[in-house]
Amino acid sequence: LHRMTFEGGSIAEEFRQDGINDRVSTASYSFMGLTMECARCHDHKYDPISQKDFFSMAALFGDQNENGLLSYHGEVPPPFVRLFKSDADRTKEQQLKAAIADAEKALAAIPTPSSANLGPTAPAAPAVHLPLDVFTKTGADNAIANGKPAKFERRSDPDDLQLTPGVKGQGVKFDGDAGFILPDFRQLGRFEPLTFSAFIRFGEKNARATVLHSTGFYTGDGDATGVELLVTEGKLRWSMIHLWPNSAVSIITKAELPLNAWHRLTATYDGSSQASGLHLYLDGREIATTVVRDTLHAKSRNNALEIGSRTRDAGFRNGSLDEVQLWNQALTAVEVASLHGIDPKTLPSKVQLTHARERTDTAYQEAWKKLQQARRDLAAHQESVPAFFAMEHSPLAPKAYVLTRGEYDKPDLTKPCEPGVPTQVFPWDEKQPRNRLGLARWLTDPKNPLTARVAVNRLWAQVFGNGLFASSENLGLQGDQATHPELLDTLAVDFIRGGWNTKAMLRRLVLSATFQQSSTPTAAAREKDPANLWLARGPVLRLTAEMVRDQALLASGKLVEKVGGASVQENAHRRSVYTFRKRTSPPDNMLIFDAGSREICQPKRLNTNTPLQALVLLNNPGFVESAQQIALRISKEATDPKDQITLAFRHVCTRSPRPTELTALVELYTQQKAQLAQLAPVAPVVPVVTEPKPDPKAKAEPKGKRAAAPAKAASISADPALAALTLVCSTILASDAAVTSR
């Protein structure tokens, strides 16, 4: 239930709200049979459901902290659920989590030193040092990495980055668009420690500015993955991100940054995947920060480090840097103080003792390595297991308000909305929690007047073509009135008493005398009840798109009756329920037979009979293949053409052909056989699809990839009898008897 996108120019909050509205509409259509979407923009004079009711229900579906945009790289954004393939995988995860807990206890059990034997207080030499005194067209002449010249690339023309007087020699002033990149510095993973230090000057109170990142190009917060140092509303945010906002650790300074003066900024990350491992320092002293996120679930992509700019995002406009340094370790507070020339002995004793433990206590260092390895092991196991979307309540979710005219960016702050439901339908039980669990219990409360009626009415429509409410998508004031209200009430009550047993209700309907009566109407019934609203005859139902396809596969003997498994492409011989569907881009054949595009909830399908449907049945390769396979099947089961055609009709229509139908099909067979016999000596006849032989040189299909087409037109039948039989089978598949249930 999401309508997210990563299209350029999309607004995250707009699509987040659209997704919430879609969930409300889907739930109201599906379970209540109401068009609540009508109340999204404003109240209606005679409609008991108000705009506040809509957004109160929206609060139930908007209580998760989500980003409205998907990752450009197609990753599943948290919160998600891992789909373990076996109990062994699930048990292994529990064991790995227990190993982490044990390692954390072992680390905590190591005593803090009683005295601060600081050892060396100066940090090791940085992995990268950029004095930024001299620039050339390809980079900085004096960039050093591990004592050697560093590979250094400019992301702009030579004149875009300006040299400016720095703390030591020259620094660089950024214009918001230009920056530079360190393509070889990629030790920026979730478990890799990092320290960034530089003299920095903020030239303005930036609403948003990227100082440092390894996220690659930027399509929105939901796609930013990697390390990120960002100015936001004059404050500094330091983050390690998998996918924002639900898989990231991030902190932000409590105070705004000082402007128009040089300061030494240091940002450290210890590789723990926890917000407690992030620290920010200004002039050697730790800055007070607030935790923004503390839920890093998976690894980030390992992109190169970029400074001062980011594609499709705001760069460090009017900001300056000098003496940029990078370490592949998290410096301690003592080492950061030493960078700024502060005597470590003036620091609080707790800070000194922490440094002594991390730098001189070998037992602590070994315990830390074991803990990090346990975390890596768990992450590797979890990332090997498929994930799928889930919803989870978050205290960080935005508060819900009535939106003026339903527009995402116009909340009416005078009209806050608590999670709730339309009380005009049924009052909320205050004993229940105000969340989706409470909603589920509200919907399934035996006293709720709608849910059971909507479900039974939909089952009735499935069996009889029309519901007892013909407008099964709308049981409200604007919908049709029930033709048999007492019957609907009785079935709804029995449905609840029977434990909401769908199979039992369907069995009851199809075993009823109403369903089993003839679908051929009398003249009087046709005149009085042409639409069969009063059920004077049995139902006449046109098969759905999925039924038509599955019926052809079953009759051909090619249907794979395996239950469960991954989705497959439409050319595979699996039931249609397993066919891969892409929202907004469903298989064309399904659309032609009235299947929905799945962009929005479709509580009731159209029921059409168009020439395009006949063309699909006669010419689509899948149906042609089915016709050929049926012909091959019946040619082995019988020898007489009349018997063969009878068998084909039974396989497809599940009944014997009437005499008139059989006569017509036999005539068609005789006629086509004669014509094809005349063509056979000089021209190919009907193509026969055969299973392609495996290519011994072809590589095995990678696990999880799309299935290859199972068959192609590989040979031509020169047998006029078999070709004519194929055409007859194709005609049967396209006949009204095959696609209509009576």
Predicted regions and their residues:
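Primarily short, surface-exposed interaction patches in extracytoplasmic proteins
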Residues: 17, 48, 91-114, 118, ...
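Extracellular beta-rich ligand/substrate-recognition surface
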Residues: 17, 171-180, 240-248, 428-433
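Extracytoplasmic low-complexity segments
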Residues: 87, 93-177, 186, 215-222, ...
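Extracellular glycan-recognition modules
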Residues: 123-155, 162, 173-239, 259-262, ...
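Flexible glycan-contacting loops in extracellular carbohydrate-active proteins
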Residues: 165-167, 229-234, 286, 290-320
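Sequence context surrounding c-type heme c attachment/ligation sites in exported
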Residues: 1-90, 590
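Beta-strand-rich interaction surfaces with strong enrichment in secreted/lumenal proteins
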Residues: 183-186, 252-256, 293-294
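Short, aromatic/His-centered strand-loop micro-motif at the edge of beta-sheets
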Residues: 239-264
